[in-house]
Amino acid sequence: MLAAVNPKTQEFLNLLLWSTDILMRPTFRNLTDSYESWAYRSGLLKQVTRLEQQQLIERDTNSPDDRLFRLSAQGRLHVLGGRDPEERWSRNWDGQWRMVLFDVPTGQNAQRERLRRYLRDKGFGYLQNSVWITPDALEEERRILVGGKINVESLVLLEARPCAGESDAEIVAGAWDFERINRRYARHLKILGEWSGGSLRNEAAAKALLRWAEEEREAWLDAVTNDPLLPERILPSDYLGLPAWRRRMEVLREAGRQLRTFNRQ
């Protein structure tokens, strides 16, 4: 679950992600004439204090002047959309599909919709509205769903392999709408292509970069939060998530260097 932060704070965290040369757990310094200081003016210190309280950034204990902060692991995960794409794509898969089958009575529409929403938010694909599928173990679902008052006639959790010749690629194509997923990544790639390099020699250039950063962040989150981030071995061959991620790292690394050229006039 992502921490609740307002759009301005989300924008600030995103800025910290690419304010250095690497997209790992980057550090920024609160310098008087930095791009960050210009972008948030007198609100910078307040932002830092709030984010530290939320454990989204942390102080660098090795800094002698106590003015170095970095994104915490939790903060980095938040900026990426709540999941680490590389970690999700690279996870092992045992070849077993897990299925959730349910038949909630028509008089319990609210419960049925709540269950569907939960499964959709967790990245499950659906073969039918009452048959949902995932490559991941159902440990959390066992605790949440089976722990309730649901009997076997209403809900069944299964581990299965196809037995009629269906390929994993066919199952993936039937359970997730990768055409729609790719359209979101294509939009994000288009915005990445609109990034303009060069030095930030005036406020007009800095404002343009800030606008682009907001568009890029929104497009990325729209794409990644609607992506199941399946293990790489079962991703469609034309899947755009991987190239979008790689290009994002390249562009944001360069944009991070661009921040250091800011010259307030």
List PLM regions with ranges.
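Short hydrophobic beta-strand that contains or immediately precedes a catalytic carboxylate
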Residues: 101
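Basic nucleic-acid-binding interfaces
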Residues: 89-96, 104-106, 115, 122-133, ...
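Mobile, glycine- and charge-enriched loop segments
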Residues: 51, 96-97
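Long, contiguous binding/interaction regions
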Residues: 1-91, 109-110, 121, 135-139, ...
